[in-house]
Amino acid sequence: MAKPGNKTATKKKVKKTVIDGVAHIHASFNNTIVTITDRQGNALAWATSGGSGFRGSRKSTPFAAQVAAERAGEAAKEYGLKNLDVEVKGPGPGRESAVRALNNVGYKITNITDVTPIPHNGCRPPKKRRV
């Protein structure tokens, strides 16, 4: 017969609630990455155009960025987010559609900032493509 031992009770993991967050939208020419973080920068949810089912040249469309932003927004809803600051980085085609999609999900967008890195004549850029 088994001895009745001391069983350690497993604690239920409690989801933290965050009211204000930051949506980082990285829109490159090939893909769009949407990450939603809290104010300290801890990631709550993220989604990409490629991970949303788009492949090849369809990954770099505004619609793919919209779907990625909707998926990240819905995943971050379970943390109780209400307000978002949006930081947009990069020259890609999904910049504006991702911001609109986050607005349509139901977040109150308080601030939109462009944080695209601009070199002060730093590294030499890659050579131009000859097609």
From Swiss-Prot:
Keyword tRNA-binding assigned: no
Example of a GO MF term: rRNA binding
Transmembrane portions of the chain: none
Keywords, sorted A to Z: Ribonucleoprotein, Ribosomal protein, RNA-binding, rRNA-binding
Matching InterPro entries: Ribosomal_uS11 (IPR001971), Ribosomal_uS11_bac-type (IPR019981), Ribosomal_uS11_CS (IPR018102), Ribosomal_uS11_sf (IPR036967)
Keyword Metal-binding set for record: no
One of the protein's GO biological processes: translation
GO cellular component, one term: ribosome
Function recorded in the entry: Located on the platform of the 30S subunit, it bridges several disparate RNA helices of the 16S rRNA. Forms part of the Shine-Dalgarno cleft in the 70S ribosome.
Assembly information from the UniProt record: Part of the 30S ribosomal subunit. Interacts with proteins S7 and S18. Binds to IF-3.
Family: Belongs to the universal ribosomal protein uS11 family.
Protein name: Small ribosomal subunit protein uS11
High-level lineage: Bacteria, Pseudomonadati, Pseudomonadota, Gammaproteobacteria, Cellvibrionales
Gene that encodes it: rpsK
